[in-house]
Amino acid sequence: MDESSLPTPFRIALEHLREKTQAEARVDAVCNNFAYVWVSDLRKANAEAPPGGWIRLPTAFPFGNPHGLVTTEPLKREDGSRVTDAHHPNHDMCKPVQSLGGANYYSWTWQDCPPIRDPRDIVGVLQWYERRIRRG
């Protein structure tokens, strides 16, 4: 995907994410003003889980909040049971990355979270998703 067409603040956020934690982060799709950002090192609660996932970021980031996560396999807790909170298998939100294996949508929103004010807040977004996965 040609990232040069994305808004400057979004590109700054993506570059910061690559520099700080996710060197392989990339945008695999854009649909309805949301970019599907692949993060290969997304830490999951269960060590046997396949790595990575797509964070749905508005192309207006940081002026719009993240909304959802797409994974190839259902997320599991440390005990091996499935994370069912806001889990939607084969949801329409998976379609932009379905050909890459996206099959499980978690409709986690940024409600009641710290305000995002800067493109560099992207690292905190990733950490928030990892905490949410651990909590199940």
How should these model regions be labeled?
Residues 1-50, 60-136:
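UBC/E2-like fold recognition across ubiquitin and ubiquitin-like conjugation systems
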Residues 56-58:
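Solvent-exposed residues in well-ordered beta-strands and their adjoining turns
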